[in-house]
Amino acid sequence: MADSREENVYMAKLAEQAERYEEMVEFMEKVAKVDVEELTVEERNLLSVAYKNVIGARRASWRIISSIEQKEESRGNEDHVSSIKEYRVKIEAELSKICDGILSLLESHLVPSASTAESKVFYLKMKGDYHRYLAEFKTGARERKEAAENTLLAYKSAQDIALAELTPTHPIRLGLALNFSVFYYEILNSPDRACNLAKQAFDDAIAELDTLGEESYKDSTLIMQLLRDNLTLWTSDTTDDAEDEIREGSKQESGDGQQ
């Protein structure tokens, strides 16, 4: 007998507590692939957190290995560089597999089944996030360009709905603005567009702060703080390595929470 939806959700929560995120992904994928009804807010957040942790560990590994590779290259240690490159390529294969998995699920199930503006923006933002993660490490000009174009398309689709349907203080709309601005800054090397987008989102939210409901107050104000942190970083005379401190969404906010 197939596992019930409730049992898979429970097992996903259990896996999260045990920090077994690959298994958490498996349980939530089972839930997402059942075409009975779309995911609840709790279920989509569980899926998001599962994938965020699985991809986050590899993204961190890739950054560390890439940094070591650059240092060894500058020292002329060719033997070490060769070994490091092999290891980096292995991590990149894992990153690609993870991104392909969630992007396939978004394409086949999650985006088509989304019935509310909130869920549509949530999943389109998620789609943009995982295309962005591909763009972070793809070195081939064609592959990187394709990943960047797909990111832009998904974020713009999400933005169109968010601006029309969600309030400026909605955590999912704010989370989208946060990650979209990071994309402009890091992937497209467009600091002006990044700052404009982040500032507009922050200012629009500030103007309607008194309408913010208690339930989303914590999530919304956290993302606003991250937007402000990035604006401070991007508009100050910082060194290149300060980019490492660019802030994205937190672990488990309503706005998906990618980093």
Curated annotation (Swiss-Prot):
It comes from the Eukaryota. Residues 237-259 are annotated as: Disordered. Leaves specific. Residues 247-259 have a biased composition (Basic and acidic residues). One of its GO terms (biological process) is protein localization. Transmembrane segments: none annotated. Disulfide bonds: none annotated. GO terms for cellular component: cytoplasm. PANTHER family: 14-3-3 PROTEIN (PTHR18860). Belongs to the 14-3-3 family. This is 14-3-3-like protein. The lineage of its organism: Eukaryota, Viridiplantae, Streptophyta, Embryophyta, Tracheophyta.
